[in-house]
Amino acid sequence: MNDIQVMNHAADNIRILAASMVEKANSGHPGGAMGGADFINVLFSEYLVYDPEDPTWTGRDRFYLDPGHMSPMLYSALTLQGKFSIEDIKQFRQWGSPCPGHPELDVMHGIENSSGPLGQGHAIAAGAAVAEKFLEARLGKVMMQHRIFCYISDGAVEEEISQGVGRVAGTLGLDNLIMFYDANDIQLSTETKDVMDEDTAAKYRAWHWNVIEINGNDVAEIRKALDSAIAESERPTLIIGKTIMGRGAVKADGTSYEHSVKTHGAPLGDGAYINTIKHLGGDPENPFVIFDDVKKLYADRREELKKIVAARRAEEKKWAEANPDKKQLMDEWFSGKAPKVDWSKVQQKEGVATRAASSACLAELAKQVPNMICASADLSNSDKTDGFLKQTHALKKGDFTGAFFQAGVAELTMADMCIGMMLHGGVIAACGTFFVFSDYMKPAIRLAALMGVPVKFIWTHDAFRVGEDGPTHEPVEQEAQIRLMEKLQNHKGKDSVRVFRPADADETTVCWAMAMENTETPTALIFSRQGIAKLPEGNDYEQARKGAYIVAGSDENPDVILVASGSEVSTLEAGCAALRADGIKVRVVSAPSEGLFRRQPKEYQEAVLPYNVKKFGLTAGLPCTLEGLVGIGPNSRIYGMKSFGFSAPYKVLDEKLGYTGDNVYKQVKEFLSK
């Protein structure tokens, strides 16, 4: 056990570095970082197990930060670990720095998740805890004996997502999840008492958490709480640590600057900064220093960790020799490579809804991909993720041998937990709900896109053909929103999200194959509620791999090109016979993914959608959904929704809203006559 004075000195060292980073950048959040320094120091210098020489070791404990604005605390602690240099943290919030304002996924530097939007980080941590339990059930305790640590703030507790995480983690009994709640009673605009009057401990106890309340700035109490959390074998643990915002901060006039809203989101300021650094034992002229006793503290921990890791790796080697088949599976699962799937085993029925076609694909994935988890937000029998569920069973407290995650009605929680499963490694995650409820998931979709996490988002009931449920449940603008993400690149130059909306059952199989092959970005799969007619005989569905392609039966040298995705492709086909009877040569293009199409060679794009040929687009979403393919101007026309939907049987809505072959004929004839 390390000397308390050394531990307190190390925490003060973190405070000095954190405050100095913010001061130098003239931007950031020093107060919370200073309050949380004691906990992060105890965790990193005495409890967190990791390999100092291999940050990617699968057996490592994971630490997930939820309040990304507390990055100065995390960067400072990681600097003491040796993962960042002093020069690195001096460049906090600057162009090209490895220390951005909010942490971004960087496992080599010890950062397990991008964080910032409050609440999502601890949902990600809960997902990682599920992944560890899932893998333990398949590989055993030797390979999966690590813990998931998470750090949350008052803001995360206030966010609605905390309800979902609290409920799910408690229900599943995630005893490998240890969460520290930095309860400093201060937020950006007010003290928390002005906006939150609740018994948080009682709330989490009601969710069946092990709740421990401590002084979060007291080393002995932090240690005792962590020991208790590690010993817990039935429940997730919440350590509520009462901390002091801006601990150790001193104003320019020499009075205390602790417990002040002003230190939350702004530099301390010249006089206060100088007095604070002096008060904490640092030199304002040379603040970016690691104290000698703190260097020794972390050097000793590194040596201790080398011994711990060596012993663990010896256990792992012995396990691998005794379980060569499982070792091979584990290597495959953690490789990040796409799984091998025999798609020929998927037998599709003609004319079914694409959600049913997706169900057939999911059934095979459940059989062929043993490290895949599928989830649904209380809609498995409707979004047809039950195709997967029928081949396995749901995850339950004490039984993680199943592979289906019933998240309940909590779309954002589900999405972020699936991200966490994949960030943990070894697991492929997919999650489903109605397309209109993708709105609840947008923050998670954005984080997955930013981090390049290849979660599979399954969205069904894709248009006004939801029918009788009416406009609250009928997506109109959602497709345009998600397809915009295909136009946004991540920092690696990839389309941030890959979107597929297949035209029939067989095209669905190809889209699912591409989704499983996509290991670099999230994939959105958009499926219909209603049955869809099969595309013309002889259609080459493998051409869907190019994002957009010419449907079988199209005419050479067309007078007009008809473009759509999803069920609207068959509606276009329904209008073609009458157009051809009038002597009009027609090409039909199915475009399940505009983003993928725009990644094709220019020659292919021009061959499918030649610039000088008139184009007519049909979409059950906003007209702008197809503007990137059909264009705008006199040679282009798009027929789409101008309002929200209505409540009526979907076939009635098709007639009333003009989504029929007859109206396609009428619209195209009128378009060509001008």
Predicted regions and their residues:
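Thiamine diphosphate
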Residues: M1-H146, K295-K296, R302-I526, G531-A533, ...
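Conserved beta-strand elements of the Class I
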Residues: F149, I373, I561-V563
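Residue-level marker for buried hydrophobic side chains located in beta-strands
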Residues: C150-Y151, M179, A375, F616
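Glycine-rich anion-binding loop/nest that anchors nucleotide
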Residues: S153, T433-F434, A564, S590
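Short acidic, Gly/Ser-rich segments with clustered Asp/Glu that frequently serve as metal-coordination loops
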Residues: G155-I161
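Non-catalytic, alpha-helical, charged scaffold/linker segments
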Residues: I277-I308
